[in-house]
Each structure stands twice: as structure tokens, then as C-alpha cells.
Amino acid sequence: MLNKSAALVPVVLAFLFLFLCFQCLYADIRCLTGKDGAVHLEMEAKPLTIEPRPGVFFDAWGYCLKGDVPTVPGPVIKVREGTKVKILFRNKLTVPASIHPHGVKYTTANVGVNIAGNPASIVAPGDSRIFEWDTAGTPGTWFYHSYVFERGGEEGLSRGLWGALIVEPVGGDPNPPDKEFVVFMHAFNVNGQEYYAFNNKSGDIELMRGDSSAFPGETWKAKMGDKVRFHLINITEEAHTFHTHGHRWLDKSCDKLIDTIGLNPFDSYVLDFVAGEGVGKGNWAFHCQSQEHMMNGMFGIFMVEEGKRVNAVIASCDEGRKTLSAPGQDRQPPTLEGFSGAYMYPEITEKNMYESFAGLEKGDGIWGDYYSPIPLYTYFNPSRHYVPPESDAYTNLLVKYRPDQCVECHEETTPGIVAEWKMSNHANPKKNPHVSAETQEIEALIGKELNNWRPGTKDGVYCSYCHGSDHEKLFMPTVDNSCGACHPKQAAEFIKGRDHGRPNHPQSWEGNVSTPWYAEYYRRGEGYSMVGCDQCHQNMSSCDDCHSRHRFSAAEARRPEACSICHMGPDHPDWESYSRSKWGVIYETTKERWNWDKNLAEVIPGEDYLAPTCQYCHMYVGNNKWEMNVETKGIWRMGVIPPKEVEFKSGLKDFPYGIKIPPMDKKLEIYSAESQEKRRKWVELCSKCHSSRFAGMWLDSLDQYMFESWRRIDEAQLIIEKLFSENAIEPPPEKRPPFPLSDLIIKVLGAEKLGAEMYRLFKQTNGHLPVIGPILGAYSIFTQNEGNPGGIEREYAEMWFWSHLQGYKGAAHAQPDISWWWGTAQGVGNLTRIRDEAEKLRRLKSGSSSGF
């Protein structure tokens, strides 16, 4: 029988599969060009947990761009010499913090240290301020860090509050590298043991003793012949060295070839060499020469691979390339002919799994190589699967119509979509002054004039703008291949939903296909059973999920019904709870009087809208601003992640059981600094109609409702855990079918992604292990296979996945019937049945009938 840790696998694996984000660890460092000689950044300091070595966890603090997940090291800031850097810094820690730069120029008001007699320049918890630096005459590799000596802030350096600051010479880089890496030298103290590290990874010395399964520490990859640059920064109070196996470089200070360099505390150094030059491909160890430091983890592996060298694209500020690190910088206006966006999947690994064309030969995501999709994938995820139709009818129509007569031809073949398009702003981009003003902005962006369509013309946003002009190479419009060219602001705002963690709209398809039971259905020949999931979770790179084809109406997308097709049902009854709340009743009885043509930021509550809508509330980002995403203020998220504020007695108390995969690598913290900021924005929004006192009470009431519901879930989880430990559930895990996709879980994810303990359990049991509780225990609702899961497990899944979430939505949206009868009452009933069933199972186990 499995031990208790095995019984807790469900919660651990939940976040592993549904929220795993594959990222490349080596740096693609882009130069920030900014505007008018200045780069404007918004940065934050937040807590996080890092895993320097598998199974070793460190409570860190990290910097990040606004809304991003914090990292150690923080974001690389690379600018051209002479650029002004202005950073709006928000401190989301519980201790003071700052940003202090090395090397560049700044005033005493921007030093980031609380020196007596100078203006205060550290930032209290929850506060913000602007730091300004001048890089004129200061080229080089520097770094920035927190510089606080009071109220706990002095731990900033040891906790990870540092990042690289690179100033490129004013004349540019005459020999730019193909690959560029930043390496911080540091040590993390965990329970009294020092784990020496490059960046945030500490290698296992067993790798140096021939154990290929040992953790390699930090890894860097390059192709044979790549010009490689390493920026070394010693962020500790100890001296370190950096030694490269097989590679050497010219040290400019002595004009000699060397392969080892020493760095004093808080020193930096830059080295350049050619990958594999004279030594070939392979895995090369780079390490600190100090035996103690290397033995305790300060090494990494430089992987040189065969392959064609890619010319340098990363070092020069002259290129003006778009960078994700400076949202406000200029970029060249896209044109519809040449636009190739990178909003949805900027990372090459994600592109390969979700966007690179595969037709209908293979699926999507981490399991994509192991199933072939149903034909409807051509519409569910068109950027990867769309196949133009092959039909003799098209050939016959060409006799009657020219290839560019899209409207005339489709008026005969699909008149409905043409009629929709003719009513749209796409066909009538200058139908009134308001639309004309927006059209003028788009015309300037794309370099084309857009006039109202007239019969016989190709005016307006014609079919070819969104589908291409070649019918043989027809494509479906997505954010990346068309929408983002004319609507880059909306596209960028929409994609920001990813920054707040899953679930979110941009990654809805990823969440769908990454669940193990999804691909398992396909392997059983039952892929069509997942169509219900596919229709809501279809790739939202297509804007028509909210703006229906072919009107693409903003007014339609502002109405709450636009959300109802997906946001309904037992696990998220948003529509049921909103439409039957007092808000929904007011909306239903007065909606024809509302002004749907106004942008949300222009709406006057009580005049244009007589009650709130989904969009008005959830797209609000604070300070009287609305954006094209709904994730900004999510505190409880979907509602299935255990909160830190509840003292759990079941295995939920140990969540997340050592698995540390951002962003879902910890319990929710309902009263963290970040959550308090979200709460402030909610109260700010609600105060447009209610008193701030009432709004605060309502949010507090929702929190307490959820805490009480989680305590009932905790009791149910504990009951089932004990049943498994008592071997009272039949058939036991080892005698029933394994967890879905168990044979691939080990193969595809491996020890590095599963974690050492989970990897061992799956390998030891071949997937014959109990999986219960949030969130992978939801497989109980999606599948049933010869006793796996059992009835009591199904009952528990319905408790936390249906009853709990129904109550959550009812309480949040002020619908009393759903809050109580669909939520609390149902959850209590689930718990009662679980208690009764547990007693029956124990009696069966003991062989007693006890009156039955």
C-alpha cells in the first residue's frame, strides 16, 4: 500500500500539468531603446520560492516587470549609453526595499539608500516611487540591487533582490554576440547549509562523478561557431572565480588568452569566445575554481550543439527590435502584408507546441506527439491546424468570379457571413465621427487608407486583410497573423492576462490540452467526447470568442451575454449567478436604454449603465482605467487553490508538497501585499456605486465564506486519505487501472519537471496511485475506468469542483440561492455522504454487516 505522500499526489500534480510553463533559461537580451532618449519601466519586488536544487527550496524576494512573475535574478536592463532610465518601482514585500544601481549616474534622491541628510529613497511596503538614472559616459556591465539596512530590508541581497544593468557603448557594439548570458554568483542558505549557485541554480556534484541523472545546475546552450558573451557578476561578499572547460578568451587587461578569471565581491566581468572552437560539441563544465564552492553547487553546463550558426540579433540597440522588457518603447508600424506578430507565443518552445503548423497529424501541448486531433481542430486552433478546404466548387466558381471578388462570391455561397460583415465597422470604417477617429489611428499605424466599402470595390477592411489574398493559402485570422497589426494595444493588453497566472484567457487552450485525461480520451478513441471542453477552451488567439464573426462588434463584446456561453455550468456558474442577481435583474429590465457604443472608460455609472456588467467590473485595472483583459484583480482565482490562511489538517496543509513551478507554486495568500492591492482596486471600482465601507465588508464576507468552505473540503480530504492508508477502498490503487497517461508522465516530464519525489512515486507504482483533491482529482468527473475512481472519490470531486465553486460564484455575485442551495447546502450534503460511505467501507473492510 502506498504511504501518505502517495495519496497526496493529486494536489501536487494538479499544478504540474495545468500550469506548467516551459521557458528557455538562457537569456535573449534585448536592448531597450525607449522614446526621446528615455526608457520607462514599471518594476515590482515580490516574494517567491525558488528551487536551487531539486527538493531544496528557498524563500526568496525577486524583482519583475509590473504584473510579471518575480525572478532571481531580476530582469536584465540593457540600454545604449546616454539613455535615461526611469523606473516606477512598487514594493509588494512586507519589508522596505529599493533599487540601487552600480556604475551609472544618479542624484542623492535616487540612490536607493536611506542615508541621513539625503532625501528618503527607500520604498515602504505597499508604496511606490520613481528612480531615475543617467547612463551618459558609463558603458559597461553593472548591476542593481536593494540597498536597505532597516526593518528586515537588509535581507534583500541574500534573498535575491538583484539584476543586471548593461550599458552598451554609444557607438554600438562592433562585434555583437550571437548568444549572451548573465551569470550571477551567489549562495543560498537553506537550514544552515550553503548552496553555492550560478543565478538561482546549484548543481549536484554527483554530476561531476559521472551520475547523468544528477542535477546539472545552470545550463547554457549554443550552436557550434556561435559567438558567445558571458556577463559575470559576483553578488556575494566572497571572492569567486569562473573557469571554463575547453574554452578560452582574450583578456583585454593583459592581452592574453585565459580560461579562468577571479571576481572580487560585487565585481563584474565580461568575456567573449566562440562556442566549440577547436574542441567541438559536447557538455562543458563551467565552475568556480574554489573546491568548496564547486562541491557545494557553483557550477553549470555549457552545451554546445551541432547546428547552423544564427547571426547576431540580440546585442545592438540600433536594431530597434521589439522587447518584452520595455512595454512603452517604439516599434516599427506593422503592415498587413508583412505583419507577423508574436503576441500569443513569444517563446519558441510554446510556438512549437501550440502555434507551429502541424495540420491534423499531431496534437498540441506536452502530449501533442501522442495523439492526432479531430478535424474540428482546424477551427479550434487555426494557427496550428487550419487546412484550407479542397473543393471542385471553388474551381467552378472561378469561372463566374475573379479570385479577388470575395464579397460577390460569398454572397452566393455563404450569404450570412457577408451580411454580418456589411454591418460591421470593418466594412464601414468611417460610418460616423467616433469610428472615423479610431480608423485614422489605424491608418497611421498600417500606412493604408480605409474607406467605407461599396459594391464592386475592395474598400473597408476587406476579406484579404484577415484571410490573405490567395484562396489556395487561406488562413483564419488570429491575434498574431492579423488582428494585432491593426489593434496592437488591445492585443498586448489581452496577452497581459498571462502575467497573472492561470487560469487566464490567453492560455485557455494550453490548460485544456495539458490535462492528462484529455490525451487519454484520444488514446482510447474517444476524442470527440472532449468537444465540450474544446469549444470553450479553444485557442483564444482568435478574437471572435468575444467579438463574433463577422461583425466583430465591440458593443456585443461589452454585453454580459458575450461571457455567458462559457462562464456557466456547475464549476463556474458566473452567468447563472449574475443574471439572477439584483444586478442582472436591473440589466435585463433596462438594457435597451444602455449606451453600448461607449468605451468602458467613458461609461458613466447610473447614466450609461444602470448596473455593473462582467466587462465593466473585471476589465477594470485601477485608477479609472480599463484594459482588454479580465485577470488583473483575481484574488481567489478560479477558487480551487488552497489558501494559506486556512489551517488544514489533511494533506492540504503540506501543499504544494515540494513542487515549485511558477506561477502556481504555492498556496494562495488572500491577505498578501499583492492581494491587498487587488482588493484596493475592487473597492475603488465598487465605490462608483456603493460606499467603500460596504464594498470592503462584501469582500471580507466572500473571504470568510471561502475559508469555511475550504475547512469542509479539508475534512473530506482527510477522510479519504485515511481510507487509503487503511486499505479500505476497493479496488486498491495497485489493483485498478493507473492514473490517465501514467506511462507518458515519467517519459515526457522526467525528474526535473516532476520533482524527485513525484518521479520516484510514479516510477515505483507505474501510475497505480491514488489521485484525489484539487485539482487533478477532477479526473473523477471526466473519466471512469474499472473502479478508478471509486464512488467516494467522485463524490469528493463534485464537492470541491462543483458545490464549492457554485457557492463561490453565488457569494461573489450576490445571488443568494446559488450561494446557499447550490453551494453550501450541496457541499454539506457531499460531506455527509462521504462520512456515511467511509463508515460503510470500513465495515466492509472489517467484515461486519452491523445490521445491514
UniProtKB/Swiss-Prot annotation:
SUPFAM superfamilies for the chain: Cupredoxins, Multiheme cytochromes
Source organism superkingdom: Bacteria
Annotated Pfam families: Cu-oxidase_2, Cu-oxidase_3, Multi-haem_cyto
Signal peptide residues on this chain, from the entry's feature table: 1-27
Listed InterPro entries: Cu-oxidase-like_N, Cu-oxidase_C, Cu-oxidase_fam, Cu_oxidase_CS, Cupredoxin, Multihaem_cyt_sf
KW Metal-binding (keyword) present: yes
GO cellular component annotations of the record: encapsulin nanocompartment
Binding of heme 2, residues: C463, C466, H467, H550
Single GO term (MF): copper ion binding
Residues reported in the UniProt entry to bind heme 3: H426, C483, C486, H487
UniProt-listed Enzyme Commission number(s): 1.7.2.1, 1.7.2.6
Domain Plastocyanin-like positions: 72-169, 217-307
Cofactor(s), names only, from the UniProt record: Cu cation; heme
Physiological role: A nitrite reductase-hydroxylamine oxidoreductase protein that probably functions in the type 1 encapsulin nanocompartment. Probably involved in reductive catalysis. Targeted to the encapsulin nanocompartment by association with the diheme domain of the encapsulin shell protein (AC Q1Q6L7). Catalyzes the reduction of nitrite to nitric oxide (NO). Catalyzes the oxidation of hydroxylamine to nitrite.
Other facts noted in the record for this chain: In the construct expressed anaerobically in E.coli contains only the nitrite reductase domain (residues 28-327).
Protein name: Probable nitrite reductase-hydroxylamine oxidoreductase fusion protein
